[in-house]
Curated annotation (Swiss-Prot):
Motif (C4 Arg-rich motif, probably responsible for interaction with PNPase): 665-673
UniProt-listed InterPro entries: NA-bd_OB-fold, RNA-bd_AU-1/RNase_E/G, RNase_E/G, S1_domain
This protein's name: Ribonuclease E
Gene (name only): rne
Compositionally biased tracts (Basic residues): 663-674
Species of the source: Synechocystis sp. (strain ATCC 27184 / PCC 6803 / Kazusa)
Amino acid sequence: MPKQIVIAEKHQVAAVFWKDQIQELVVSTGSQQVGDIYLGLVDNILPSIDAAFINIGDTEKNGFIHVSDLGPVRLRRTAGSISELLSPQQRVLVQVMKEPTGNKGPRLTGNISMPGRYMVLMPYGRGVNLSRRINREEERSRLRALAVLIKPPGMGLLVRTEAEDVPEDAIIEDLENLQKQWELVQQQAMTRSAPMLLDRDDDFIKRVLRDMYSSEVNRIVVDTPAGMKRIKQQLMNWDQGRLPEGVLIDCHRESLSILEYFRVNATIREALKPRVDLPSGGYIIIEPTEALTVIDVNSGSFTHSANSRETVLWTNYEAATEIARQLKLRNIGGVIIIDFIDMDSHKDQLQLLEHFNRCLETDKARPQIAQLTELGLVELTRKRQGQNLYELFGQPCPECGGLGHLVELPGEKGFVSLSPTAVNSSIPPRLVEKPILSPPVAKVNDLPKKEEAKISSPLDLLFHPNYQEQGDRDSNRRRRRRRGSEFSEKENIKSVGISRSKGPSPSPTKEKVTGTAPPRRERPSRRVEKTLVPVDVAMTTLEQDIYARMGISPLIKTEYADQDPRSFMVSVVTAGAALEGNTNGSGSLVNAVITTVDNGDNGDNVPSDGLTIVSEVTAPTPVIEQPREETVEPEQVVLPQLDDETPAAPVAEESAPIETKKRPGRRRRRSSAE
């Protein structure tokens, strides 16, 4: 089948066409290429893996060499560990056998090989080998006998497929050129300083013709007139000064570039996509990974066969042909797993494998089919030859970092990448941090008051929650905390010594500097100021103690119809105190506070049985201290021992309903004055 070669020398890209389809691509990367010979220095030795890193002049990546690839170094000495064969800063002659991929440097070998048109010279090799593609036994015998006669002593030879039916003089001339090239490399290795590049096939046209030209080629197109002359000269050198018959050599002169005119760029774009459509309507998916390449075959919209068996077999046949082409076009190497459509017939499976094997015969990378697994997967391996298409023309996505997808996490707006090397251009709005122009101003209320908040103010009977805000316990808790914070605020300012004139001080408890978290807004106060009606209630000391223990409001002794404690300001006085006044001579009545403690909001020093506590907080008088002495031992308070001045009837009347209101599960609480 005729072939044609299109060479774009300006872009260092060449394509091989067969049946109007691109079968192979040749790309010159300009960096370390397969076949380059370097004089390197041993940089690091790793005895644990029997390998070493060789400095070949690349500032970013060193070359990797295994102990099995040392070649002449291993042959000269007794076999041992790599630390016995190599030493740091030792000069070694190495050749690139695998180009760098990703974060890995080039794979090196000490077994140097010099490829020619018909022969491959192996200076450190042994014996004579022939290409497997030479099928005729007579030709194999002729070439083997010739190679044995002309082989240099101490070296090895490999006869290439192109040497078939070639005269002996051309083969001998090719071998002489290889020997001269090797002698030049040895001279440079003795005189040059390491690390240094000693030999590279810089002539791109010569390299393409050497690897791709065969007797099946009938046309060669190049983009420059100078390139056309060099092609003719090279072909004449290989054919004893004559141009091969039936080969047309052209120079591209169209307005479009040679890559666009022959649809080379379009083919590269399609080859970089994972999906490949088949002529019958099916398609295949090619997914390269770090460990291997996975290929999946799907029938798609193909429904033209009479039964499902023919549909599956026909789709698998088309997929096998296209997969063999894609392996060469994309230069996929390593382990390859193919998931063909399941076939129940064992005969169909064998036919598919035979057809697939015939399609792979034209591949120079020598793919080998390993087996057909029980799950219907075809395993094969293909020799790596340089970089694949993804490494040559692709790079990791800056958005996803090469993962192939972005993620949107719960509670976040926008998609982000999971790769730390990705540069996210669309960062979620909530993650964008605004610059802070000035440090946050600390408020006095933000000062630490963990310890000071435990200090309670003196009890005041007039503002006791049980009297003033009975039934509104939620707001009562907030109000008590607010009063406690105001009290602790003064204590903090005195103890810490913070002055407002010295500038703001950040608070570690209230405000936190985060990305774009809005400042916390204070909840507006819902307190409504009410005008309280002053009420004077005459009570003895014992009555005050009993009312406080039972949680009874002194308003019961008044004649007001509305006895809501939140509407009155109660003043409790002892018998005759209204006439005499208090002991400090101010003329004001004795103030008292009744504190109600809820079971769910206990302090550190307050019992948890929900009793009411009475305490007086004005200037110390005999009237105020009397209940404190009696409450120390509450068991001594007995109703029959009341004084004559205390009316017994009201106490009995008040105590009777109190006993009826007691519940079985209620416990009595000691006074806070104790």
